[in-house]
Structure formats: structure tokens, C-alpha cells
Amino acid sequence: MRPTRPVSWLTPARKAFEAFPDGARQTVIDALSVAAEGGMAGIAKPMKGLGSGVFEVALPFRGNAFRVVYAVQLGDELWVVHAFQKKSTQGIKTPKHEIDLI
């Protein structure tokens, strides 16, 4: 069994995450904890087009949609590289301009 990885944050991702509602933040923390222990939460999925080891937590919460992107193949840590509230009300696809930021 592998030891639990520490979770590190890029500063812009942390600031955006801190603006999420409390319940959404706790759900994301739970999903990141699963990832840090080597698993994948049910609300996480691999991000297409960004290589292996990059995952997205997609969270619908009280009529809004929140996303957190993390990478697991950066040394011994799990890195949260991007967090945002999805503004579009149509479709579930992550907007291209958000992917470009990653």
C-alpha cells in the first residue's frame, strides 16, 4: 500500500477554490483525499487531451457546477492546478478557455 500523498495547490487554484461554497469545498476535499490515497472518487475523471495523470473533479452543487483539476504524476505530491466555477448552463463539457489555462 502506498502512503498518502500530500496535496499541494497552485496559488490561483487555491484562491478560486476558497470562493466555492462550504459544501462544495468539503466534497472536493473528500475527492482529493481519495486521490491522495491512490484511488479515484466517483466525481473524478481523467481529463482528455492533457496526458495521463491529470484528472478533473466535476461537482454539481445547488444548481451550479464547480471543477477542480489535479495532477498525480508530479513527484510525490498530488497537485491541484486549477479550480473554477463553470458558468455555462449548457452541456457538461469543460470550456476550452478553462482547459487552455491548465
What are these regions (language model features)?
Residues 1-65, 74-77, 84-101:
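Basic, Lys/Arg-enriched alpha-helical interface segments
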